Structure formats: structure tokens, C-alpha cells
Amino acid sequence: MKKGLEKFYELVEAFESLPTIGKKSALRLAYHIVMNDNYCGIKIAHTIENALKNITKCVKCGSMSEHEICEFCLDDSRDNTTLCIVQSAKDIFIIEDSKQFDGKYFVIEELDQEALDALISFVDENEVETILFAITPSIANDAFILYIEDKLKTKDIRFSKIAQGVPTGVSLENVDILSLSKAIQSKVSI
């Protein structure tokens, strides 16, 4: 760290700690904000502060929300009988961009008893008939799917997962919209 530029390098390190931002990009961002556009830096800082204060998890489905219950859960035009299970709230926005799904969502970041109980309550409350698993294809996640299917076997639910248009081991955030759209359209029963 250069003496006299500690604050600048702290900013570089902060940017570098973000996903997909390397040293060069972090340097460019920090330099731009400090030397070219102070207003941009202030706006980013204010926006981050507001987001951290106001965004939380939906108490029903686990999606991101600025309210106790998210817009997806409150939207009466969505199909209550179809549920898409994802492993991250950010996956919901990726699926929404595909414009191929109009049901409800449920986020299971970690499969534990609390998450399973919440899922069962959500399924019962919404009278779910179909569950679509939109999770990263892998052997571990296939076991995850089978476990949930087993726990819900007493209910009359059809299970499917997005088709293998999504490469095995690739996170949904790294899949292009066309591939994701085709994968959702080609979902397979399990």
C-alpha cells in the first residue's frame, strides 16, 4: 500500500472484495469515483446504505423484499398452484427475466428442518399442485430434489426440474437468458 494513499487503497480493496471484480477493475472503479465523479461515489454509497437498511427476506418464500411479504407472494395474478424452488433469491430475478414462469417461488438456501417445515406450510397454504426445481444441476442437488420429493410424497404434487440446457455445475446466475428460457420450456418430470 502506497503511503499517503491508504484511503484510496481501502476503496480498491472494498471493490476487489466483490464477486467478479479483480484488481484492475477495482483500481479503475476507485480511480473513476475519486478522480472523475465524486457524485457517483456518493450516490453509490447512499444507495448501498438504503439497500442494506430496507431490503430483507420475505417471511413467506425467502425472496428479497422491501416489505415483510414480497411482491411475488402478494401478486394475485401469479399461479398459486405452481411453485418454483430455487437455492438463492437472486435466481428468482434471473428466472423472471426469462418470462417463462408465472407461478410462486420458494428459496431454500440450506435444507434443514426449519426450511422443510416452511416449504410444507407454503405448499399447503397455496394448494400447490406442481413444483419446478430450478437449481444448479449436480449429483448433490439431485439428492436434494429426491429428499424434498420424498418429504412431500403424501401430497398430490407433480414434480419437475428445469431441463438440461443449463450445464451441470453452472450456477443460474451464469446462464444466458435464452438457455434458461429453453431449459424452463423443456422441463422434465421427475
Give the positions of each predicted feature.
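Short cysteine-rich clusters marking metal-coordination/redox-active sites
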Residues: C58-C61, C70-C73
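Long C-terminal interaction/binding lobes of large macromolecular proteins
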Residues: I120-I190
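Extended, structured, electrostatic nucleic-acid-contact surfaces
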Residues: M1-P19
